[in-house]
Amino acid sequence: MKNFQIISDIEKDLHHETASEIKRYLESHGKCAKIVGSSSEVTQIDWADLVIVLGGDGYVIQAAKRFAGSHVPIFGVNFGTLGFLTEVEKPRIQKALYEILSGNYEVEKRMALTGRVQKTSVGEAIGIAINEFIIGKQDFGHMITANVYVDDELMDTYVADGILLMSCCRELDTRFELKYI
């Protein structure tokens, strides 16, 4: 790996202090690194071999959605609370970077959900999710009827106040579709 894009949550990494340390470390090892404050500031990502995201799970999800389809791996450093989607905590960054630069890593592919909600009176909404989709009713007193499809095959029909569809981080290429009746 030679080129690194660093995305740093300015609220959690005051003045990009940690991002700047990472950049200096990478450059001292002959690598190229660029820092931005959010994934929306990145206009092109294909030049990078790795995206390093400093923040919580929300920042990792934002980057994963933004770069979906680019095939550039994302390495998350937890600056948040739980860090389900991040790889390391802040104190272990330098050791992790050393391992990455030494080639001691594996790229883990994680599933992204593509969801499509159709409602005859409103139309269609399509979204990408890393963790889950939550679909709820709009009106009090009315339940929703949802046909749930997995890879274009009807899985089941549900009548409920809402539905929660969650991803499994080890599977690939699964799409959920909800069709209101």
Where are each of the predicted segments found?
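Catalytic core of DAGKc-family lipid kinases
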Residues: 84-162
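Short, well-ordered beta-strand core segments
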Residues: 51, 74, 163-164
